[in-house]
Amino acid sequence: MINFIASLLGKLMRWIYDSLAAGGIEPENISYYAIAIIIMTLLVSLITIPVTISTQKQAEQTQKIKPKMDEIQKKYSYDQQIMQQKMQALYKEEGVNPGISSCLMMIIQLLILLGLFRVMNDTKTFVFPEGIEDIRRDFYWITDLTHPDPLWFGLPLLTSLSQFLVTLFSMKTNPQMSEGPMSSMNKSMLFMPLIFFMTFIKLPAGLPLYYTMSSLIRLIIMVIMHFTVKKPKQLDEVNDEKVNNKTSKK
């Protein structure tokens, strides 16, 4: 499975690299190899946009039924098992699957990351079978993206900060993430940036470059959706206004 994903990513990266190389002189401070990783990240993010949108919609639906959730928590606070059963019944009735979309996104990201790890560790096999000796792989202060970033405060730190911003924005814009049965898991996500930092300082720098760009793109999409998509409360106000208009016409 991972080899298959690595093969697809390698072919995509090679196609992007060849397209860039055919276009002219390579920039001085950033190699086509690095640019290919950035463009590949953008393409992968575009492909996973439906999952991102689904995650956001599930969050909005959960927010809409939050009053009912609060009522159940208050009414059955004496028995956690009964409360969980009532919550599950409410989710089923309302067609809400909290956490499913976000878990799916995490699984997709993990599979891609593992595939990319295989590509970065064996670039010669998956991207340049003819050899990589003559291929530039630098990115500003990094001389070779197939090796770890020499600066701990470079890409590993940027990766941690970008992931922290994504998690923080999700929790701030969706209050239900910090309350109810999902609260413990979501709060534990705040520690993930630290884990990423400790991990990425030892891995090929191409991985934190990919993950940083992926997190920033995801954050941009979330911000756009947050400020453009109508919230449940706004939708209710619109529906009430339509009903009032019809009533007044009669």
Where are these regions (language model features)?
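Helix-loop-helix
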Residues: 1-250
